[in-house]
């Protein structure tokens, strides 16, 4: 049974957002009501992983939370000898992810690991997924993380990246923010919840523009980049080595 997200329903001294036990308990409801098209994004990331998975390789889900993308990838893999490695830096998320994955049987092995992406060793990868993860990594560390991913991707391998983005100018950025807030209102969030969540997350999640993402990926060496989904200020893209 999905528990409704009411973390910010009452007035409070708002702390910086973190993926703690309180968030874990309501995360499925929170993400569905907060990210437009989340189910489509997760499903498509799985299909793309199945398309680009190479035999005898690893697939990574970096910032795996409760394992939605991991499960989607596992359902779509038809290639021999693939191993999925799911990583998150939240102990609460990792523990719940392991329990969640046990409820679904598959011949594709999955290892769920507690770890810092900045320190993670990536090896023999054909697919790396980051579903709304890079945005929580400090700006100064993003280039190094992406360079490490690129260096350890096999030729023809892909990075599947979903991010909250900001527009190129303030007028358009405010438009996208307003549309997103309307989406959250439609899904039952109050003005207080929207305001307090924004306060909680603004210091820990710092989005880039789409052009910043594409320029950085190209400069690192990816041969092709393409956005395949966008709704308001949420975008999913693929980068091919």
Swiss-Prot record:
Keyword terms of this UniProt record: S-adenosyl-L-methionine, Transferase
Coiled-coil parts of chain: none
Transferase found in the keyword field: yes
Entries under Gene3D superfamilies matching the protein: Vaccinia Virus protein VP39
InterPro entries per UniProt: CmoA, Methyltransf_25, SAM-dependent_MTases_sf
One of the GO biological process terms: tRNA wobble uridine modification
Enzyme Commission numbers on file: 2.1.3.-
Pfam families, per the entry: Methyltransf_25
A GO term, aspect molecular function: S-adenosyl-L-methionine binding
Catalytic activity of the protein: prephenate + S-adenosyl-L-methionine = carboxy-S-adenosyl-L-methionine + 3-phenylpyruvate + H2O
Record bears the keyword S-adenosyl-L-methionine: yes
Binding residue positions for S-adenosyl-L-methionine: 38, 63-65, 88-89, 116-117, 131, 198
HAMAP family xref list: Cx_SAM_synthase (MF_01589)
Function description: Catalyzes the conversion of S-adenosyl-L-methionine (SAM) to carboxy-S-adenosyl-L-methionine (Cx-SAM).
Family (UniProt): Belongs to the class I-like SAM-binding methyltransferase superfamily. Cx-SAM synthase family.
Subunit architecture: Homodimer.
Protein name from the UniProt record: Carboxy-S-adenosyl-L-methionine synthase
Recorded name of the encoding gene: cmoA
